[in-house]
Every structure is written in structure tokens, then in C-alpha cells.
A protein has these predicted regions:
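An N-terminal-biased, well-structured beta-alpha scaffold segment characteristic
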Residues: 2-110
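A very general structural signal that marks isolated residues within well-ordered alpha-helical segments
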Residues: 32, 124-125
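Rossmann-fold dehydrogenase core element
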Residues: 109-117
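Conserved small/polar residues in nucleotide/adenosyl-binding loops
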Residues: 117-124
Length: 126
């Protein structure tokens, strides 16, 4: 699977959804990873760290969204990102559907597979 990590653009959000170490683990499991240039800077990870982990660094979020089968984010997609979503694409992030009906509708209209971190549990239900 080709996994993409765009830079977070929501106000005051500096985290990144995937560390270089995590990207390296995904690569070792046979996945390809792309990341938007600068996406890790707010968390202390340079583009070089990602490149050394086998990640392809892309110039724009649009490129990341266009190439990736699965998008990993910290925060839910915001208005500027909604046009990038496409049918069958998996988006793995913190979704807040109850608080944002327009986001729910946009995800349904685009046909994405929306997976929210908040709804994942371990086999022990923890």
C-alpha cells in the first residue's frame, strides 16, 4: 500500500502522523511511504530523516493526496483538503464527525474509508 502523510494545516497543529521510525517499519513490511516536505518539522523531524528511512519526500500536499492509497493525519481534513479526497482512499486520523456534519457529508460523498484513531481498540478492548 502507498501511504501518504501531508503536512498538517489546521491552525496551531504542529504534530506529524508518522515518525521516520514508523515509516521505516512500514517500509520493512512492504509498504511505500510518501510525505509532504516539511511535514515533520514541527515534531523535530527533517525531510532528511524521512529520506534516510526510505520515504519519498514530495513538494506539495496535492501530490501526497493524489498518490496515496491511505492518508495518515493527526487532525481531521479541513476545508482546503476536502477536494483531494477520492473514492476508496483510506484516511486514518482523528475524525470528529459528531461535531462536524459537513465533514461527514464530504467523506461520504467522496467515498473515502474514514478510520478514526478514537474508535480503535486492542483485542482486550483497551
Amino acid at each position: 500500500m502507498l501511504i501518504g502523510v501531508p503536512k498538517e494545516i489546521k491552525a496551531d497543529e504542529y504534530r506529524v502522523a508518522l515518525t521516520p521510525a514508523g515509516a521505516e517499519m512500514l517500509s520493512e513490511d512492504g509498504h511505500n511511504v510518501v510525505i509532504e516536505s516539511g511535514a515533520g518539522l514541527g515534531s523535530g523531524f527533517t525531510d532528511d530523516f524521512y529520506a534516510e528511512a526510505g520515504v519519498k519526500v514530495l513538494d506539495t500536499a496535492e501530490e501526497v493526496w493524489a498518490q496515496a492509497e491511505m492518508i495518515m493525519k493527526v487532525k481531521e481534513p479541513i476545508h482546503q483538503e476536502l477536494p483531494y479526497m477520492r473514492d476508496g482512499q483510506v484516511i486514518f486520523t482523528y475524525f470528529h464527525f459528531a461535531a462536524d456534519k459537513s465533514l461527514t457529508r464530504a467523506c461520504m460523498k467522496a467515498g473515502v474509508v474514514a478510520v478514526s484513531y478514537t474508535h480503535l481498540t486492542l483485542p482486550t478492548k483497551a
